[in-house]
């Protein structure tokens, strides 16, 4: 498991405004919790804590969001 920005199948972050949205999205993917990181590297995006290794994350630098 790792702490990371969760990503969809296009390598795009989950854009957020509030923590409860991120907490729901991250937990349903197996993470312990999360928060909405404002004005981060990818804008306002969900940061998951202890996200399972098989769940896609935003790669840094990685490919761009498609």
From Swiss-Prot:
Pfam families: Toxin_3. One of its GO terms (biological process) is defense response. GO terms for cellular component: extracellular region. Its main location: secreted. Coiled coil: none annotated. It is found in: Secreted. Keywords: Disulfide bond, Ion channel impairing toxin, Neurotoxin, Secreted, Toxin, Voltage-gated sodium channel impairing toxin. The keyword Mitochondrion does not apply. GO terms for molecular function: sodium channel inhibitor activity; toxin activity. Expressed by the venom gland. Residues 2-66 form the LCN-type CS-alpha/beta domain. Disulfide bonds join 12-65, 16-36, 22-46, 26-48. Belongs to the long (4 C-C) scorpion toxin superfamily. Sodium channel inhibitor family. Alpha subfamily. Has the structural arrangement of an alpha-helix connected to antiparallel beta-sheets by disulfide bonds (CS-alpha/beta). Alpha toxins bind voltage-independently at site-3 of sodium channels (Nav) and inhibit the inactivation of the activated channels, thereby blocking neuronal transmission. Has paralytic activity in mice. This is Toxin BeM14. The lineage of its organism: Eukaryota, Metazoa, Ecdysozoa, Arthropoda, Chelicerata.
